[in-house]
Amino acid sequence: MPQITVVNQSGEESSVEASEGRTLMEVIRDSGFDELLALCGGCCSCATCHVHIDPAFMDKLPEMSEDENDLLDSSDHRNEYSRLSCQIPVTGALEGIKVTIAQED
């Protein structure tokens, strides 16, 4: 199981184990981070699972879909490392990744 570091909106870091085959959204939400709302449950329709990805891991992620890109455009906190965590499957390649929960819009 890959270890990931989740940084909450206050800047506090926590290390959690992530089961492969799940999404980052599921792992973060199920690890007790209530500030990751994930209102749509992972259907890529709300952008409430917005995170900032460690730049060193951006090339290990699947390409961003047009739908994900459009949803992120609505965020005031979007940056070049923004992704929707519901669109990122956990794989062994994510071992050691740091994911920061974006501030709410």
Curated annotation (Swiss-Prot):
Ranges where the 2Fe-2S ferredoxin-type domain occurs: 2-105
PROSITE patterns per the UniProt record, alphabetical: 2FE2S_FER_2
Keyword terms of this UniProt record: 2Fe-2S, Electron transport, Iron, Iron-sulfur, Metal-binding, Transport
Organism the protein comes from: Stenotrophomonas maltophilia
Protein name, entry field: Dicamba O-demethylase, ferredoxin component
GO biological process, one term: P450-containing electron transport chain
Xref: PANTHER family: FERREDOXIN-2, MITOCHONDRIAL, FERREDOXIN/ADRENODOXIN
Superkingdom field: Bacteria
Protein family per UniProt: Belongs to the adrenodoxin/putidaredoxin family.
Gene3D superfamilies the record matches: 3.10.20.30
Function: Component of the dicamba O-demethylase multicomponent enzyme system involved in the degradation of the herbicide dicamba. In vitro, functions as an intermediate electron transfer protein.
Pfam families documented for this protein: Fer2
